[in-house]
């Protein structure tokens, strides 16, 4: 079999975090009752006219600046004409000829090192409604709440060569956009969606192969599986002497396979023409400067600051800053208790373990920095020991309980009175003569059994190090 190279480009749609839609005052809130966040504008009623939401432009420019794009200072909207039930106007207001941002790049890092992925353009557009096919066999229903929600579409050049590079690119984009506050980028809620354009060609060939577009990719895992599946399908066709058809394919995560949806359209198929109801967008130097001045600290700068300000290893700083949400928790808890390394340890070890056990990502963390800081202080003061602290943290992780109140109500404070502890230890010694004899006969491991029995007798409230010290004294 010949050696093949995979060529991948992405179209990433990101719902912007505005309170209202791109061309009307309807709410963009996720999860409302069907068709309650609608009006004549976003449902395409005759006579209704769009008015551009200024915040959409500012978010688009902010993302463009953060991805090294050139900002188009004279930009226009265009009509993309197509007929589909989720599109009540029978056209979408988008940008083809003069998109808001062009010629950017993002740096990604994989096991093979660092690489720049070029961004062809970023354009603004409105989202479509949502079709639901599962209620009845012969009827589809549509919810127009999403119709008119503002999007930016980030179109990459075909610079990626593997699923690993694609995931690294998407993670970098998501982190950047979340840090900007431009979107929450939740794939499971559809606020970040990626269409994957993929082709294969013989290694060394200059000409691109025929591409297909993969849709219905709702997680990074699905994206990786779809890329591998489509790569294998195209190679199999070429090895059989058949042609790859330019088409849009729908990925089925349950079946781990895809099926053809429609032939892949080109721009001319949509009969684009300038949007007559919206004036051009003029982005002045002053406006760009204002947007740039408001930009928050992005991940690369935060990572460098953590290493310097908190003396945290680079690996830990990378984990803490992967999610803006986790970074915010870390900084807030550190500000409250003043112990960055101890806060970092709770996030790096116990939090990551519980996230993995519950198949969650860091953006799903519900506990408050206040309660994490209180837990750090309780351990630091010796009020509770490390084993009790882990029990308390699990409650914080799941229910965001107040650790001080929980420790008090459940009698979990450490036994810090050595006199009281000696009485308990002596009782353990008296009840375990064989372990005592083994210890005196040189079997040093026997002390561990006595420590364990003491911890059991104190219901885990004693400090194991103190127990060990007192046992040595009494023996």
UniProtKB/Swiss-Prot annotation:
UniProt xrefs under Pfam families: GatB_N (PF02934), GatB_Yqey (PF02637)
The family database entries (SMART domains) matched by this protein are listed as: GatB_Yqey
Record SUPFAM superfamilies: GatB/YqeY motif (SSF89095), Glutamine synthetase/guanido kinase (SSF55931)
Q: What class of enzyme is it?
A: ligase
Q: Any idea which GO molecular function terms this record carries? A: asparaginyl-tRNA synthase (glutamine-hydrolyzing) activity; ATP binding; glutaminyl-tRNA synthase (glutamine-hydrolyzing) activity
Q: Give a yes or no for keyword Ligase in this entry.
A: yes
Coiled coil (residue ranges): none
Q: Which GO terms describe its biological process?
A: glutaminyl-tRNAGln biosynthesis via transamidation; translation
> Which EC number(s) does the record attach to this protein?
6.3.5.-
Q: Which Gene3D superfamilies match?
A: 1.10.10.410, GatB domain, N-terminal subdomain
According to its UniProt record, which reaction does this protein catalyse? Answer: L-glutamyl-tRNA(Gln) + L-glutamine + ATP + H2O = L-glutaminyl-tRNA(Gln) + L-glutamate + ADP + phosphate + H(+); L-aspartyl-tRNA(Asn) + L-glutamine + ATP + H2O = L-asparaginyl-tRNA(Asn) + L-glutamate + ADP + phosphate + 2 H(+)
Q: Does the keyword Cell membrane apply?
A: no
Keywords per UniProt: ATP-binding, Ligase, Nucleotide-binding, Protein biosynthesis
Report TM segments: none
What does the annotation say about its assembly with partners?
Heterotrimer of A, B and C subunits.
Q: What does this protein do?
A: Allows the formation of correctly charged Asn-tRNA(Asn) or Gln-tRNA(Gln) through the transamidation of misacylated Asp-tRNA(Asn) or Glu-tRNA(Gln) in organisms which lack either or both of asparaginyl-tRNA or glutaminyl-tRNA synthetases. The reaction takes place in the presence of glutamine and ATP through an activated phospho-Asp-tRNA(Asn) or phospho-Glu-tRNA(Gln).
NCBIfam families from the entry? gatB, PRK05477.1-2, PRK05477.1-4
Family, as annotated? Belongs to the GatB/GatE family. GatB subfamily.
Can you say what this protein is called?
Answer: Aspartyl/glutamyl-tRNA(Asn/Gln) amidotransferase subunit B
Gene from which the chain derives: gatB
